[in-house]
């Protein structure tokens, strides 16, 4: 009987614990709301996705690719979140954080499995670029493939859509969107004990970076 009373008392105390309030956001679809989501401080309408099964049975046809991607992400400590449109600026479909290495997909633009898959591949490739810069424990990214290997129509699209400083990085990620192996294989290497640059020959610019940071020698 005493055990029951103690148990009820604990439950009663828990019932009256204050609920953690959501941070005050200055405005939706702003840098403030996006930052709040990326810092994992805003959680309303934000859900972590740990498997394609969390997205629904219609993703089963992509299970082999997604199982590999999620397994690599889990090993690397990368988290993937599906969030309401209110957090994203403009027409943003997805985001990758070089600080936390997590990425986020906008619910509004990912209702179709094919669109969601493209966002996962795109943002996942940014993690691969992060890894190519030496380690995920930094805030830098590096080009993996020579620009000449990316289709011209993708490069032109990236140049129209993104700032010049990031266009080439985005062009690579856009190219990865249309491949069922590029992001999967890149993340698998990143999650392995083999350095990225031993599998993907670094470009001259990336080589200079890796030498300067001490990851490889001349």
Model-based region annotation:
Residues 17-20:
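Sec/Tat signal peptide C-region and signal peptidase I cleavage site
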Residues 4-15:
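Sec-dependent N-terminal signal peptides
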Residues 83-117, 130-131:
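Active-site scaffold of zinc-dependent metalloenzymes
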Residues 141-218:
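Metalloprotease/metallohydrolase-associated module, dominated by Zn2+-dependent proteases
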Residues 23, 28-99:
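Auxiliary, metal-adjacent structural segments of Zn-dependent hydrolase domains
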Residues 124-141:
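Catalytic Zn2+-binding segment of zinc metalloproteases
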Residues 56, 60-64, 110-119, 163-168:
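Soluble non-cytosolic domains of exported or imported proteins
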Residues 72, 127-131, 176-183:
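Structured segments of extracytoplasmic/periplasmic soluble domains
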């Amino acid at each position: 009987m005493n055990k029951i009373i103690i148990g009820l008392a604990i439950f009663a105390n828990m019932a009256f614990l204050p609920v953690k309030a959501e941070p005050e956001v200055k405005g939706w679809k702003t840098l403030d709301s996006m930052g709040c989501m990326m810092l994992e401080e805003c959680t309303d309408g934000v859900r972590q996705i740990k498997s394609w099964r969390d997205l629904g049975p219609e993703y089963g046809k992509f299970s082999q690719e997604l199982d590999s991607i999620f397994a690599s992400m889990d090993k690397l400590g990368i988290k993937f979140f599906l969030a309401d449109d209110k957090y994203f600026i403009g027409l943003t479909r997805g985001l990758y954080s070089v600080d936390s290495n997590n990425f986020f997909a906008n619910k509004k633009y990912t209702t179709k499995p094919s669109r969601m898959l493209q966002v996962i591949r795109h943002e996942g490739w940014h993690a691969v670029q992060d890894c190519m810069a030496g380690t995920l424990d930094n805030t830098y990214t590096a080009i993996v493939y020579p620009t000449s290997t990316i289709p011209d129509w993708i490069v032109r699209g990236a140049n129209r859509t993104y700032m010049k400083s990031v266009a080439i990085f985005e062009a690579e990620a856009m190219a990865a969107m249309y491949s069922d192996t590029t992001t999967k294989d890149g993340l698998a290497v990143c999650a392995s004990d083999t350095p990225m640059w031993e599998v993907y020959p670094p470009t001259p610019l990336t080589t200079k970076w890796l030498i300067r940071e001490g990851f490889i020698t001349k």
